[in-house]
């Protein structure tokens, strides 16, 4: 009893600390260290100091696992092996979270963490049991390590075919691709045109047909696995007999499946059957990659207007909570649609034999509203910075290209119509802010103020409730 009371007192004291501030600061530290390293002469193939704004942009893009790049020739041609290692490290840290990685290495040295550290880390990684947070963090690291090693081994046949007699280069490219795909980063070492064929990408164009489709297929699998949430992976592959899946797992799997299949079908209508040139495989890849990955098998500038609009919808949704993906998350959209249909039918909000509170609905709607506000602000800012700077850069209408870029940045996707290398300094800063906000989530920033408000103790009272007309 005494121990339980002591634990309760400790938890109340820990709640005075703000884990969200630590999360934000940890990402900022990684970004600035990474940007400095990318600027170094031995990180650039030119052997000269790199442009700091470009280095900062790529540090943000990698740490926020986005994939947008201002390098005209791509990171594979712009960065040396050292620079590529720095990028890969930031992708890995950004996908898992700096606090998660740091906790793992600390526990290798110390067998136990202090109560304060366990509580804070549990809040940051989303663990519901702070007592077992170390075990949970180790599971996250182990899952990532296993998936990335398997992905590297699966990808080796492609790279050994592309680089005969160069096994070390093949292994490095396969490892980088596996880590980038699993963490939904969208970076590769092939050039500036991702996986698009017939546009002058020497690596992609040199691949036999089987190798190309093999590469794209296993990339899609890694993207999906990385975006469905570590909690779902643990739940599905926990190998515990007679244990039912959590409602969270069912919601994530159902929503993910619906979005993938519906996305495939809609892209077939807008860009497959519509005469825009996408084949069946490319429309499937488009449906997968726009959920925060950033790889592409088709020139995004050539996608129809309807395809771009639907693509923005997918980018806004993103992946699932506690995954390597960005966006407002699948569970958020699920909750909003569930609440809407429940309201129309005059029934309580129920799914998978569970009832959901109004607080969850309000939180989901707040997240969507904050996300849309960030997107609108980003679009206005970039439009002001660019003015007529982008005229003639892309075939697409400039405003459409900017909207696509803004959604891509906020959703930490990384696809682009091709305007990224041409944008001005101000626009680069705006995109960096959008990528940062998209990776951490608007609610992370909102929670800082919410936590500070909760700390203020005062006289509690309530106003009289009153309804007014809506709609």
What role is predicted for each listed range?
Residues 1-471:
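Membrane-proximal intracellular helices of multi-pass ion channels
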């Amino acid at each position: 009893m005494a121990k339980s009371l002591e634990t309760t007192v400790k938890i109340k004291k820990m709640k005075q600390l703000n884990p969200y501030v630590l999360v934000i600061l940890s990402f900022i530290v990684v970004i600035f260290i990474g940007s400095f390293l990318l600027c170094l002469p031995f990180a650039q193939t030119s052997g000269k100091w790199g442009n700091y704004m470009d280095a900062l942009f790529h540090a943000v893009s990698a740490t926020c696992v986005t994939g947008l790049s201002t390098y005209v020739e791509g990171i594979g041609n712009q960065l040396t092996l050292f620079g590529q290692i720095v990028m890969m490290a930031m992708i890995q840290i950004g996908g898992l979270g700096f606090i998660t990685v740091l906790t793992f290495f600390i526990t290798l040295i110390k067998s136990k963490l202090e109560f304060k550290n366990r509580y804070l880390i549990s809040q940051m990684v989303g663990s519901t049991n702070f007592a077992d947070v170390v075990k949970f963090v180790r599971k996250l690291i182990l899952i990532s390590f296993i998936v990335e090693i398997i992905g590297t081994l699966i990808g080796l046949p492609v790279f050994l075919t592309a680089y005969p007699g160069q096994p070390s280069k093949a292994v490095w490219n396969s490892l980088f691709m596996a880590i980038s795909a699993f963490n939904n980063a969208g970076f590769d070492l092939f050039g500036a045109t991702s996986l698009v064929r017939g546009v002058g990408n020497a690596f992609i164009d040199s691949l036999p047909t089987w190798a190309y489709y093999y590469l794209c297929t296993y990339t899609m699998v890694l993207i999906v696995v990385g975006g469905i949430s570590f909690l779902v992976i643990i739940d599905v592959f926990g190998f515990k007999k007679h244990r039912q899946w959590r409602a969270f797992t069912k919601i994530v799997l159902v929503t993910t499946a619906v979005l993938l299949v519906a996305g495939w079908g809609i892209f077939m209508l807008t860009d497959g059957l519509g005469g825009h040139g996408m084949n069946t495989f490319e429309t499937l890849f488009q449906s997968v990659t726009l959920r925060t990955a950033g790889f592409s098998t088709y020139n995004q500038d050539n996608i129809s207007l309807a395809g771009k609009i639907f693509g923005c919808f997918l980018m806004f949704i993103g992946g699932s909570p506690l995954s390597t993906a960005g966006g407002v998350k699948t569970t958020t959209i699920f909750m909003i649609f569930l609440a809407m249909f429940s309201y129309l039918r005059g029934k309580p909000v129920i799914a998978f034999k569970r009832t959901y509170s109004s607080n969850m609905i309000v939180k989901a709607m707040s997240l969507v509203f904050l996300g849309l506000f960030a997107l609108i602000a980003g679009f206005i800012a970039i439009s002001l910075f660019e003015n007529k700077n982008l005229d003639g850069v892309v075939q697409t209408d400039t405003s459409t290209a900017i909207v696509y870029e803004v959604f891509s940045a906020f959703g930490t996707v990384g696809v682009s119509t091709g305007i990224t290398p041409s944008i001005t300094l101000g626009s680069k800063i705006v995109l960096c802010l959008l990528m940062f906000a998209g990776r951490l989530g608007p609610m992370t920033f909102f929670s800082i103020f919410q936590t500070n408000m909760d700390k203020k103790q005062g006289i509690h009272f309530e106003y009289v409730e009153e309804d007014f007309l809506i709609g």
